[in-house]
């Protein structure tokens, strides 16, 4: 069981009423708290929760419509996302209890200060390298719209400026990261047909490809509901139409693709996690048509080339710079 869930269960008597668990782990906590419901924005966690506890976890960027008497936020990595989520919960909990739980190394003690606008927070427990904080919501805020927290910036591209709409919690929020910047310079000669932006984030790659190759069918895929929402906003801001999916890794992608483009993620919260990328490299051939191409940008120190060659075919380094490499391979 997740250590944060273990800390909650040390205080289980506090959590017997109607409770919302926001950002919960995909463990047995719902089984131990029969009156609790979940709210997840991670497609993999949501699928696991739905399989074990059907109908008890809500997925998306907005809090569930059902009422709740108290709520626990599992601290996310992003401070901006924490602000949005605490606001969404506190706005529904006037005079009631809001809890924050997180690992010490994720900065939960500092994040507890974000409870100050709502009342007087206090630390309830410290165990398993985690802390549990509580505040009685004396000052319930007006709910913020997610779009009011969006950051917009423009990328000067050959086809004209591209507007990017980035939401809290999305990778490289409010700015272009170096890996994607390098890949944007090397989108020439993509195969015609159906192209996938894997781990789409705010939709920079997918939107750029759709504008440059308007006759191609473009799909954008991410595990995170906030990323999918960002991608939809980016596409709309540029008058583009493409399919946006949420799903847990390459297994959620369509079959019969002509190309896969990715600046793949390697963090889950504060933890380094290469599983989604390695799974993509192992299974890309299954999702690509014969002659279909995989184009990956990654940190130069990551040894992806042997993995690509083992599972897909000969792999070339198309470009490198700023500590990144672009790998290119085709399915034979």
Swiss-Prot record:
Question: What EC class does the entry list?
Answer: transferase
Q: Does the keyword Protease apply?
A: no
Q: Name one GO cellular component term.
A: cytoplasm
Q: Where in the cell is it found?
A: Cytoplasm
Query: EC number(s) for this protein?
Result: 2.1.1.172
Q: Indicate yes or no for the key word Calcium.
A: no
Enumerate the UniProt keywords alphabetically.
Cytoplasm, Methyltransferase, rRNA processing, S-adenosyl-L-methionine, Transferase
Which transformation does this protein catalyse, written as a reaction? guanosine(1207) in 16S rRNA + S-adenosyl-L-methionine = N(2)-methylguanosine(1207) in 16S rRNA + S-adenosyl-L-homocysteine + H(+)
Gene Ontology molecular function, alphabetical: 16S rRNA (guanine(1207)-N(2))-methyltransferase activity
Pfam families hit by this protein: MTS, MTS_N
What family does the Swiss-Prot or TrEMBL record give for this protein? Belongs to the methyltransferase superfamily. RsmC family.
What is known about its subunit structure? Monomer.
Q: What does this protein do?
A: Specifically methylates the guanine in position 1207 of 16S rRNA in the 30S particle.
Q: What is this protein called?
A: Ribosomal RNA small subunit methyltransferase C
Which organism's genome codes for this protein?
Pseudomonas fluorescens (strain ATCC BAA-477 / NRRL B-23932 / Pf-5)
